[in-house]
């Protein structure tokens, strides 16, 4: 049975930190999750605006305009390492730069002028206008302005209702999915997608990961109608309702869109993970099994066997060097954490601490059932908790994002970036080897001999 941890934490957060008792344990304590951050806890979560921005950002032929202060735009500029095979308009940061006078008199004219100028200059396929806290507080009618500019310019101009004060980045995911749902299904013409077609939801082409996955899907005979939103195109998203299956990789950000498309268009969806050898193989098998095509299933078996054999020798060598090492994990979504635990276990690394910013009760129950005895599981944690627990559990490596990097280095431990700022592909079979190499080089770097750990 999962147990509460003895660490001194805020009273209202005690249900968000538990300790698992072992693999296969089904008698678990339900971790408290999916709730607003406790005041004073210094949460690592980002705001609603940031959540919507990271989801829509990879759509590379759309204009992304932030209606708010310049700080909001600069904070999220190039926020994902999402690559594009065509235009790179998404990598340019545009902002209406609301200031004191605009708060008094309104920013509507600034927004109209910015949209006119940018659409005329860059000729995007669509425009997303991100509402920020300031825009929401002064009451600009952004919806009306978007409708006006859409009629004037002839392209879709969409208000992303992402005022930061609404909640956390999880609420931003919902705002982004709501915006995407208004774009899906607007393509003219007949359905030209094949009977074995899918949409890739929640795969953001970080460091080219979408291309690695699509290469194998093409070999299986699967057509990818739209990447939502990795290497995304407005035209592809418009016709995404033609696909026969939605494959959801980042379930936290895209499950709501998948459910909506299931309701509106009858498209089923499956949750998969392309991180780690075991989960990557399962993802391709799940796709093949959905289409009930014996030929596709046989091709998939051959593909998986070939790719696994290609990487296993190196993974065994890395495991021999890392056996018994200990790692801590803190990422955005709990579904990703499940794959990371399995991937680390394959190279001999034990997970002693795992958590996420926006995990669900279902995913945390799964985490508790697969964790080793004594593993601490946290929801919506903060630097103090993460650093203290990492040191107490003897972690030698921290896997997280840009916010956790300085914390790990201050503790004198290795760090592996697994969030959206990274530049190395870690998905798929090839990505599994890259991840193992990253873990190995981080853990075995000679620099840690000279780093003094906090007492």
What residues fall within each predicted segment?
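An N-terminal assembly and electron-transfer interface module characteristic of large anaerobic redox
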Residues: 1-455
